[in-house]
A protein has these predicted regions:
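Soluble or luminal CAZymes and related metallo-dependent hydrolases
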Residues: 20, 92, 144-148
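Short, basic/glycine-rich phosphate-binding loops at helix/coil junctions
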Residues: 74-77, 124-136
């Protein structure tokens, strides 16, 4: 996570730089470094903040909050509910697609379950817990990142 502080985040830098210097965030960072060293954690470190990388703050039209990343290999990609193509859409995403169809009469315009196109169109797909241990739902729900993502989601919705 050392690279997290120095990289660019598509316009989110002012919010990130302020939080990255706080003690609670330093604790989260240290915890995640240990977790990644000792366990299988999803998503891969380099895409933990993928939701912010793909959706600039000025482009956010809607925020969709998920609980935590998918717990199985090859699924978590740093976007709530999204899975990389050609992974089949999980049941939670199929429910979202079904709701879209019922409400709009149209099918979702994504290939498989990869919601990257939505993120690039202004849908902030943010999990309240950004990481998870393989096979263990809610395993990182108490490390403080939930407060961080709630803060980001709240600040974002104030500007919609």
């Amino acid at each position: 996570m050392n690279a997290a502080v120095s990289r660019s985040y598509n316009g989110w830098e002012p919010l990130f730089s302020e939080e990255f210097s706080k003690d609670y965030f330093k604790g989260i960072k240290a915890f995640l470094e240990r977790e990644y060293a000792q366990k299988t954690v999803y998503p891969p470190k380099k895409i933990i903040l993928n939701a912010f990388d793909l959706t600039a703050p000025q482009d956010v039209k809607v925020v969709i909050l998920g609980q935590d990343p998918y717990i199985n290999p090859g699924q978590a990609m740093g976007l709530a509910f999204s899975v990389p193509y050609p992974v089949p859409p999980p049941p939670s995403l199929l429910n979202i697609f079904r709701e879209i169809k019922e409400e709009t009469g149209r099918d979702s315009a994504v290939k498989g379950g990869d919601l990257t196109v939505w993120a690039k169109q202004g849908v902030l797909l943010l999990n309240t817990s950004l990481t998870v241990v393989r096979g263990v739902s809610n395993s990182h729900s108490n490390i403080g990142a939930v407060s961080y993502t709630h803060l980001r989601a709240h600040e974002t919705t104030l500007h919609l």
